[in-house]
Amino acid sequence: MSVSTAKRSLDVVSPGSLAEFEGSKSRHDEIENEHRRTGTRDGEDSEQPKKKGSKTSKKQDLDPETKQKRTAQNRAAQRAFRERKERKMKELEKKVQSLESIQQQNEVEATFLRDQLITLVNELKKYRPETRNDSKVLEYLARRDPNLHFSKNNVNHSNSEPIDTPNDDIQENVKQKMNFTFQYPLDNDNDNDNSKNVGKQLPSPNDPSHSAPMPINQTQKKLSDATDSSSATLDSLSNSNDVLNNTPNSSTSMDWLDNVIYTNRFVSGDDGSNSKTKNLDSNMFSNDFNFENQFDEQVSEFCSKMNQVCGTRQCPIPKKPISALDKEVFASSSILSSNSPALTNTWESHSNITDNTPANVIATDATKYENSFSGFGRLGFDMSANHYVVNDNSTGSTDSTGSTGNKNKKNNNNSDDVLPFISESPFDMNQVTNFFSPGSTGIGNNAASNTNPSLLQSSKEDIPFINANLAFPDDNSTNIQLQPFSESQSQNKFDYDMFFRDSSKEGNNLFGEFLEDDDDDKKAANMSDDESSLIKNQLINEEPELPKQYLQSVPGNESEISQKNGSSLQNADKINNGNDNDNDNDVVPSKEGSLLRCSEIWDRITTHPKYSDIDVDGLCSELMAKAKCSERGVVINAEDVQLALNKHMN
């Protein structure tokens, strides 16, 4: 500070006074000398403590033990620092990985949302004209992600040429989307206009550009075939769905649906007139349908065979195992042959019994099986009408059988007809009326009315199980005796008084009989009053008496025994009534735990350690015989499954 003050003093001094300047100069020199002296003293004072606390002196004072301790502490501190550093770095690496995964998820979500936004914008265009906001959204998405499937050129092209859709067309499109039918329509116009519709084509759902040709006739044929077989519909739908899902460049099903509607809104003919709108099934275009669930477990061929027991969607009629005898019967039966009709006329068995009846064909085993089916539809199934004739006279029955055999050869003119049970000969009512006319014989009146000898002889055998004496009374008031159908019935007489009353005779007065019945009722009422009074006076025991042996063997009052007997009877009645009602209230116990589905059985078979040694075909056939139908499908008892597995191990 002295130097600076001196310099300032020199600067402040005016140059005019030289004397003062010289005096001040001498004083300045003195001040500088003093300052130098004070500086040298301060330096000496600072050097002295440094010499006292020098490092060489401290190092010489430390012991080797303290040195080792300090080095160990330093190493431990350095080790801890390195561990903390590594731990911190690992935490930071984990954070970086989590942030990277979050970033990837965000990118995937952003890409998905962009695609969804593009899809929504495109769908919105179909219901209303395109606006500027739609084009801005598409341009923004194109700038953000240039790898999208559409480009700016397409967007600019769409902006330069906007879609001009009238409001009427939009409303019609919406109505057509809303009003789909769930059944395939019967299109009768296509049968007449097959040649006209060859050129018209529908877009294919499997083609991403919707330009695959497909004639309308083929489409309608496929739709009609699909109504006959539901499996074909499901398979075709599942195949189309798989192709749509696996094709990266394919559009959604709504795009294909819209193209179908726009293409086939009006199918115009050659004359230029518009026909009706084509009705399409919404099931063909629905993505919510579960194609894998086809009412049966499509696990393997094993389950498809097992499901035949209860029937499937493709084959609703259940199939049962057929024995070898049944197979031979079906192979040789006349049902499978078109030249031998099975049904015959039961009312004119004398003229329309086919050649396959037991009376005519008893040759080989095959014809025996055939006869069991050829008799179906006739009276008595597998029996001729002659078997119903009363067999009191064996010779008469054998003769009639032989005569029918000869008559079959004469009158069997319609055996090869398509409808053998319809007779060409007219039905003669005179034969019936004359045959059942009162007081006449069967053969006499038939000869007068009809001269056909074969019909005359068979008239006895037409209805052999009806007694004409009871069914057709005569005018005679006493009795009627008609010619019977068989010799055993010749002695039967008709009691006229059993069915018809004559008021002129004695004892046939209905009013008198009514009065007599009234008197009998009064007597019975009086008798019941007397019996009730006796019961009250304990002169008659109302309970039934027990055997004397029982009374002697069991001591006690008769009243107690009777009371016990009455109570036991009541209990027995209650038990019987309970047994009658048990059938109504029977509940089959549930065995859900012990019943296995086909998929569970197949899992058990495939996981068996000796799976290669199992006879799967034999096991399947045996389980089909033991299968049961339930709400869940085909189920089999677990014990039966285990026994079958043990049985079919090679």
Swiss-Prot record:
Q: Per the record, which residues fall in region Transcription activation 2? A: 430-537
Q: What induces it?
A: YAP1 expression is at least partially regulated at the level of translation. A small upstream open reading frame (uORF) retains the 40S ribosomal subunit. By leaky scanning it then proceeds and reinitiates at the functional YAP1 ORF.
**Modified residue annotations for Phosphoserine:** 9, 14, 17, 204, 372, 528
Q: Segment Leucine-zipper: which positions?
A: 92-120
Question: Which intervals of the chain are annotated as region c-CRD?
Answer: 598-629
PTM comment for this protein?
Depending on the oxidative stress inducing agent, YAP1 can undergo two distinct conformational changes, both involving disulfide bond formation, and both masking the nuclear export signal, thus abolishing nuclear export by CRM1/exportin 1. The disulfide stress-inducing agent diamide leads to the formation of one of three possible disulfide bonds in the c-CRD.
Bias type Polar residues, positions: 150-162, 195-209, 551-570
Question: What Pfam families does the record tag this protein with?
Answer: bZIP_1 (PF00170), PAP1 (PF08601)
| CDD domains named in the record | bZIP_YAP
| Compartment annotation | Nucleus; Cytoplasm
| Regions of compositional bias (Basic and acidic residues) in chain numbering | 22-50, 58-68, 80-89
Where are stretches of biased composition, namely Low complexity? 226-246, 392-414, 571-580
A GO molecular function assigned to this protein is:
molecular adaptor activity
Please give the positions of the paired cysteines in each disulfide bond.
303-598, 310-629, 598-620, 598-629, 620-629
Q: Which UniProt keywords apply?
A: Activator, Cadmium resistance, Cytoplasm, Disulfide bond, DNA-binding, Nucleus, Oxidation, Phosphoprotein, Repeat, Transcription, Transcription regulation
* N-terminal signal peptide: none
Q: Look up the further comments and give them.
A: One of 8 closely related fungi-specific YAP proteins (YAP1 to YAP8), which all seem to be transcription activators of the environmental stress response and metabolism control pathways and to have similar but not identical DNA binding specificities. Present with 1600 molecules/cell in log phase SD medium.
The domain section of the record reads: Contains two cysteine rich domains (CRD), referred to as the N- and C-terminal CRD's, n-CRD (Cys-303, Cys-310 and Cys-315) and c-CRD (Cys-598, Cys-620 and Cys-629), respectively. Cys-315 is not conserved in orthologs in other yeast species. A nuclear export signal is embedded in the c-CRD, with which the nuclear export protein CRM1/exportin 1 interacts only in the absence of disulfide bonds (or otherwise oxidized cysteines) within the c-CRD or between the c-CRD and the n-CRD.
Family to which the UniProt record says this protein belongs = Belongs to the bZIP family. YAP subfamily.
Q: Give the protein's recorded name.
A: AP-1-like transcription factor YAP1
